[in-house]
Amino acid sequence: MFPLIILISFSLTSLSATATSGAGGGVANLYTCLIDHNVHNFSIYPTKNDQSSSNYFNLLDFSLQNLRFAASYMPKPTVIILPNSKEELVSTILCCRQASYEIRVRCGGHSYEGTSYVSFDGSPFVIVDLMKLDEVSVDLDSETAWAQGGATIGQIYYAIAKVSDVHAFSAGSGPTVGSGGHISGGGFGLLSRKFGLAADNVVDALLIDADGRLLDRKAMGEDVFWAIRGGGGGNWGIIYAWKIRLLKVPKIVTTCMIYRPGSKQYVAQLLQKWQIVTPNLVDDFTLGVLLRPADLPADMKYGNSTPIEIFPQFNALYLGPKTEVLSISNEEFPELGVKNDECKEMTWIESALFFSELADINGNSSNDISRLKERYMDGKGFFKGKTDYVKKPVSMDGMLTFLVELEKNPKGYLVFDPYGGAMDKIDDQAIAFPHRKGNLFAIQYLAQWNEEDDYKSDVYMEWIRGFYNTMTPFVSSSPRGAYINYLDMDLGVNMDDDYLLRNASSRNSSSSVDAVERARAWGEMYFLHNYDRLVKAKTQIDPLNVFRHEQSIPPMLGSTQEHKYSSE
């Protein structure tokens, strides 16, 4: 159990005062400050090609998951710092402020737009990498756990499974994803229809703010505690630890992988029925879809005589035995024709491995659950993602439009995540994540390619943007919803002169109002009616905008009328 320390005070008085004054001084100043305050685990950008160069780039690349941001021309951090304790984390924040370095916080490095390891505003910046702060402490008596902000989702799952086979946590399927960022943005996963998001199951947190204070839920206040659950990472401070609620699951669950390749017409018919059925299934049953263009030998028919144009993969998790899965699916969705050999019974932790990138296309993973602790992910690639929410059933013509656009790009994917269940029952203002009742499913558009295809990156980027525009009539509007954990810079970015409030003298209410209104363009897509409350929370916890990125929430230093809109 982590102690609930409200304020760390250990000879940092002078450092804190210097930091808030914006003293500056460059990398030498930062180096001296870190060493003086017992922070030794860091790597400085190399000025020559030697061992330090190798160490720096190995560290930079280790958790850099989107290779779009690994190119040599991309901005690089001056220093990469790996704090080993909360004391070192506090010192790191204050030293970075003293030396006037922008802070980018990295947990697992899965930011869709690289915001945890790249800064495009021209300021010198550092990466504060939390990988050394990855302890998970489980307390079965209270059915809670403390997970440090650098722990991955896989590490949390593994720690729970080591002490219980009937407890779980509701989060995503990527085991190498960092909990600090994932939970900050909401954290949707296969248990969300049953238990809500990861952030819905946070009962306390330890946040280190820009002044080096370590704040628990009571100390930060309910407005900030509300904001850090679903309001997006990189905004409020650095999450030192989450206290999460453990969730009861049966000893045996059932997983299914169901492949139904065929013509666009055939797949569209399945999807039309799927969108009606899945939001209304029992909460214990989640049935998602992964879609990609068919890239198969002509003689591979998969028992289907129709031409293979689209390759859909239906992924199911049911909190119960296989017999019930088959009964429910064949009663509610007979068109899918789920077969006995397409489903397997296993423990919940085995299902986490089954649906992870550690398994092959058929879900085979050797059942070695210790692999969930691995931080490094093989097979990294280049990718761009976008998201949508669907509130009304998509017509047959609409589904065909989806598939026609998908077929244009062999590097493209679609992911349909079903809503309903607990996602309908939890109030849309319970936490900062707002996409609740009224959503049938969420869409993730993905273009993913390898290095040998990177010369065509502009083609892939143009494709996904065109796809997104084509889908406008079929998805939510006023505003068009988006998921903050799938950041999309196409929606807009903060302007340098608006959001870089580097010190007190640069503040003025007019520019802050402009910044807040500019950010509303994408802020309301991510947060709907919760945007203004997030601005208030940001102003309360980080008025100088120390923790920021290209789509962070700006603080309000003046006053303005709350914006009104209607969500359709």
From Swiss-Prot:
Q: Name which cysteines form disulfide bonds.
A: 33-95
Known function: Involved in the biosynthesis of pyridine alkaloid natural products, leading mainly to the production of anabasine, anatabine, nicotine and nornicotine, effective deterrents against herbivores with antiparasitic and pesticide properties (neurotoxins); nornicotine serves as the precursor in the synthesis of the carcinogen compound N'-nitrosonornicotine (NNN). Catalyzes a late oxidation step subsequent to the pyridine ring condensation reaction in the biosynthesis of alkaloids.
Domain FAD-binding PCMH-type residue range list: 73-249
Q: Name one Pfam family in it.
A: FAD_binding_4
Report the top EC class in one word: oxidoreductase
Induction (record text): By jasmonic acid (MeJA).
Q: Which InterPro entries match?
A: BBE (IPR012951), FAD-bd_PCMH (IPR016166), FAD-bd_PCMH-like_sf (IPR036318), FAD-bd_PCMH_sub1 (IPR016167), FAD-bd_PCMH_sub2 (IPR016169), Oxid_FAD_bind_N (IPR006094)
**Positions where Pros-8alpha-FAD histidine occurs in the chain:** 110
The EC designation for this entry is: 1.1.1.-
Q: What is its main location?
A: other
Q: Where in the cell is it found?
A: Vacuole
Phenotype upon loss of function: Strongly reduced nicotine biosynthesis but accumulation of dihydromethanicotine. Inhibition of jasmonate-elicited formation of anatabine and other pyridine alkaloids.
Keywords associated with the record? Alkaloid metabolism, Disulfide bond, FAD, Flavoprotein, Glycoprotein, Oxidoreductase, Signal, Vacuole
- Protein's UniProt name: Berberine bridge enzyme-like B
What PANTHER family does this protein map onto? OS08G0158400 PROTEIN
- Cofactor(s) this protein cannot do without: FAD
Signal peptide (UniProt feature, chain positions): 1-18
Q: Which Gene3D superfamilies match?
A: 3.30.465.10, 3.40.462.20, Uridine Diphospho-n-acetylenolpyruvylglucosamine Reductase, domain 2
Query: Which pathway does UniProt place it in?
Result: Alkaloid biosynthesis; nicotine biosynthesis
Q: Which GO terms describe its molecular function?
A: FAD binding; oxidoreductase activity
Organism, as annotated: Nicotiana tabacum
